[in-house]
Amino acid sequence: MAYYMDTWAAAPAERPGMIASLSLSFKKAFAELFPQRRRGHSEGDYPPLRGSANNSLEEHYRWQIPIKHNVFEILKSNESQLCEVLQNKFGCISTLSCPTLAGSSSPAQRVFRRTLIPGIELSVWKDDLTRHVVDAVVNAANENLLHGSGLAGSLVKTGGFEIQEESKRIIANVGKISVGGIAITGAGRLPCHLIIHAVGPRWTVTNSQTAIELLKFAIRNILDYVTKYDLRIKTVAIPALSSGIFQFPLDLCTSIILETIRLYFQDKQMFGNLREIHLVSNEDPTVASFKSASESILGRDLSSWGGPETDPASTMTLRIGRGLTLQIVQGCIEMQTTDVIVNSGYMQDFKSGRVAQSILRQAGVEMEKELDKVNLSTDYQEVWVTKGFKLSCQYVFHVAWHSQINKYQILKDAMKSCLEKCLKPDINSISFPALGTGLMDLKKSTAAQIMFEEVFAFAKEHKEKTLTVKIVIFPVDVETYKIFYAEMTKRSNELNLSGNSGALALQWSSGEQRRGGLEAGSPAINLMGVKVGEMCEAQEWIERLLVSLDHHIIENNHILYLGKKEHDVLSELQTSTRVSISETVSPRTATLEIKGPQADLIDAVMRIECMLCDVQEEVAGKREKNLWSLSGQGTNQQEKLDKMEESYTFQRYPASLTQELQDRKKQFEKCGLWVVQVEQIDNKVLLAAFQEKKKMMEERTPKGSGSQRLFQQVPHQFCNTVCRVGFHRMYSTSYNPVYGAGIYFTKSLKNLADKVKKTSSTDKLIYVFEAEVLTGSFCQGNSSNIIPPPLSPGALDVNDSVVDNVSSPETIVVFNGMQAMPLYLWTCTQDRTFSQHPMWSQGYSSGPGMVSSLQSWEWVLNGSSV
């Protein structure tokens, strides 16, 4: 999955005939575009995001979600509804793509692979660049960026004419691109995320040395860009630049490209996030030339296989049933941030073995002391439990091997025991090593088979349990990873053959992004959005829909607002399709459960979600009108407010991390909630209504308004609505109304975090509003309260709020949304490693200077080396 800007604004470039420095060009362009940066402005000084669900930030992130061919066919027939739901619910634009069905030829073939330097791999591929899945594709362009024929023409034909339009804008702004220069545009409908247009030299015998130097210059500029100036690029595909219509001799061309790449990285210590360089062509002579040059300059292919092959991704995720997520992760077991980490060892020696030693080293001496007690015990248990101590987990499950018991049965029983211990409500995630493959010397394929069997059996038996199961493979243990990868693929295929629609998703997990991209020809949902959080939520919703075999549950309190028209739609769906729909309403939440065959199920869910989006907008619109009315009361500014209403709703933008917010961030993280983003809320109309309410409370009671900073968790789907019209009890997460039917806030982040851990899986994002709440006069709450009780028996005036404990309140309940003003929205996760993923640093305020531009811009490198 990728998350890149797809358009860039024109930048001033070095003029032809001058030596171009990439660093200099970039700095000049940046200074010209964003002069406020020179004046030392912090991120808080940049223009904020405007509006409601769709902010005007023009930085786009593009992700691809792989799906099965049968799912593609179903979604294709519901594509307009899918687009509408993703747009209205998550603010994302979506398209469907299926290269194989579109007539693409044979799958991509890799014919050479070699480690260039530690951390970067170079490979040669036979593939069509218009369908090669990498982060950036290099186009062989001309000085005018007119993409009419050859590779350039093919890229525009497949990717869309917007690529040519962006190129024309660049030329209009900066003029021709010099030979050796590059320009960056979006990729349109191509499976990559941006195109690097490189202007290669034309070959002439009389000026051959100049052409050679210019080709080297172009390659260096490409490498500079992907290693220094766009740190989000991990994979780049480069063609045999200039070897086509520019008539550069093929073998000389490929040799120069390889030698330039080798020399570029020879002494480099820093190379950004780049991990793979693909040399790509769909023509056999060019592929052969690239391969020959690679072997000559880099040495022979060190791969263990003889023929073309595609690497598996570094992380695999499989959704099983309703609540279980199974992942294969490359990483260190002792660094996992799940609730449980699994260790193993012989009964009298839990300290032997590489995994055990790594865990003990990280956990500290306290765990060693605990295990010393276990070693002295004569009782045999399959699994011993200790605290996590200095590990980032709550518990460690120690699997005890026994030399006199069948090792296959031990592993089977140990897996079952570990998983059953996860039924405790405070455990939502567990990390296993490749159990049995070390000290027990089980065949790796056998261990994988047993571990998967037990996970699947657990998921089948405990369908309602939300649990993330990670199998963590040490990064250098490629053989074990491939074996577990193959077993996961086999299990996924079995799910699909049995009618389960669960899509096997190759995606980032535990902070790692997949390396190789989608398999060529794989159908996919292409998502584009302006916020990483929105994209995560959209992906989670899609996967939850597709993993359901024959049922889907929609939880949305706006179901309470469905009228006759909407219920007629539900009835019509049950008549015209093979689905049944049941509605459940409780004091905590309202749900619709849809059951039926997969195709009908997806169709019904799409239509219902569209309907609920309309209802939510209608309800919010009415509340907004009331809000405008309240904010104008008692003032002489009604006419001014009326004019503002036409052009202003609210602002939600990255907050500058003041000392106060940094301290608050530490409070979140102390409770196990890792902050990925904090946004400030600015809604002048809501603030005016809040201040009016505050004034009324201060005039009414001697205690005044009693303002406090409190917290409330809100589902993603209601975050923008709260920013727009304020808090309402139907917008919060489900709760037990033990103190009355009001709007619940908490003073304690620890209490909020404890509730999150019991109800949310570790891979979900958590949204917490920090608000100024007018508590005023309060009393003990009661479940029968629909408004606060009177100030005293028989009094007409009532309290302003109720609490859980009058002497030391932790939970505060108000019954009027105007008593709470949202100030900040904190987006968190329980997975610390996920919170450190580089995607969160793009456009969010995680520290001084960590802000992306609020403009689209095309960056051009121009100039000549001679």
Swiss-Prot record:
<dbReference type="GO" id="GO:0006302">
    <property type="term" value="P:double-strand break repair"/>
</dbReference>
<dbReference type="GO" id="GO:0010608">
    <property type="term" value="P:post-transcriptional regulation of gene expression"/>
</dbReference>
<comment type="similarity">
    <text>Belongs to the ARTD/PARP family.</text>
</comment>
<dbReference type="GO" id="GO:0045893">
    <property type="term" value="P:positive regulation of DNA-templated transcription"/>
</dbReference>
<dbReference type="GO" id="GO:0003714">
    <property type="term" value="F:transcription corepressor activity"/>
</dbReference>
<dbReference type="GO" id="GO:0005739">
    <property type="term" value="C:mitochondrion"/>
</dbReference>
<keyword id="KW-0539">Nucleus</keyword>
<dbReference type="GO" id="GO:1900182">
    <property type="term" value="P:positive regulation of protein localization to nucleus"/>
</dbReference>
<dbReference type="InterPro" id="IPR043472">
    <property type="entry name" value="Macro_dom-like"/>
</dbReference>
<dbReference type="GO" id="GO:0044389">
    <property type="term" value="F:ubiquitin-like protein ligase binding"/>
</dbReference>
<comment type="function">
    <text>ADP-ribosyltransferase which, in association with E3 ligase DTX3L, plays a role in DNA damage repair and in immune responses including interferon-mediated antiviral defenses. Within the complex, enhances DTX3L E3 ligase activity which is further enhanced by PARP9 binding to poly(ADP-ribose). In addition, positively regulates DTXL3 protein levels. In association with DTX3L and in presence of E1 and E2 enzymes, mediates NAD(+)-dependent mono-ADP-ribosylation of ubiquitin which prevents ubiquitin conjugation to substrates such as histones.</text>
</comment>
<dbReference type="GO" id="GO:0005737">
    <property type="term" value="C:cytoplasm"/>
</dbReference>
<dbReference type="GO" id="GO:0140802">
    <property type="term" value="F:NAD+-protein-C-terminal glycine ADP-ribosyltransferase activity"/>
</dbReference>
<dbReference type="GO" id="GO:0072570">
    <property type="term" value="F:ADP-D-ribose binding"/>
</dbReference>
<keyword id="KW-0391">Immunity</keyword>
<dbReference type="GO" id="GO:0010629">
    <property type="term" value="P:negative regulation of gene expression"/>
</dbReference>
<dbReference type="Pfam" id="PF01661">
    <property type="entry name" value="Macro"/>
</dbReference>
<keyword id="KW-0328">Glycosyltransferase</keyword>
<dbReference type="GO" id="GO:0003950">
    <property type="term" value="F:NAD+ poly-ADP-ribosyltransferase activity"/>
</dbReference>
<keyword id="KW-0677">Repeat</keyword>
<keyword id="KW-0227">DNA damage</keyword>
<dbReference type="GO" id="GO:0051607">
    <property type="term" value="P:defense response to virus"/>
</dbReference>
<dbReference type="GO" id="GO:0005654">
    <property type="term" value="C:nucleoplasm"/>
</dbReference>
<dbReference type="GO" id="GO:0032991">
    <property type="term" value="C:protein-containing complex"/>
</dbReference>
<keyword id="KW-0013">ADP-ribosylation</keyword>
<feature type="modified residue" description="Phosphoserine">
    <location>
        <position position="42"/>
    </location>
</feature>
<dbReference type="GO" id="GO:0005634">
    <property type="term" value="C:nucleus"/>
</dbReference>
<dbReference type="GO" id="GO:0000122">
    <property type="term" value="P:negative regulation of transcription by RNA polymerase II"/>
</dbReference>
<keyword id="KW-0520">NAD</keyword>
<dbReference type="GO" id="GO:0000077">
    <property type="term" value="P:DNA damage checkpoint signaling"/>
</dbReference>
<feature type="domain" description="PARP catalytic">
    <location>
        <begin position="635"/>
        <end position="853"/>
    </location>
</feature>
<keyword id="KW-0234">DNA repair</keyword>
<protein>
    <recommendedName>
        <fullName>Protein mono-ADP-ribosyltransferase PARP9</fullName>
        <ecNumber>2.4.2.-</ecNumber>
    </recommendedName>
</protein>
<dbReference type="Pfam" id="PF23254">
    <property type="entry name" value="KH_PARP14_8"/>
</dbReference>
<dbReference type="GO" id="GO:0002230">
    <property type="term" value="P:positive regulation of defense response to virus by host"/>
</dbReference>
<dbReference type="GO" id="GO:0042393">
    <property type="term" value="F:histone binding"/>
</dbReference>
<keyword id="KW-0963">Cytoplasm</keyword>
<keyword id="KW-0548">Nucleotidyltransferase</keyword>
<dbReference type="GO" id="GO:0060330">
    <property type="term" value="P:regulation of response to type II interferon"/>
</dbReference>
<dbReference type="GO" id="GO:0090734">
    <property type="term" value="C:site of DNA damage"/>
</dbReference>
<dbReference type="InterPro" id="IPR012317">
    <property type="entry name" value="Poly(ADP-ribose)pol_cat_dom"/>
</dbReference>
<dbReference type="GO" id="GO:0004857">
    <property type="term" value="F:enzyme inhibitor activity"/>
</dbReference>
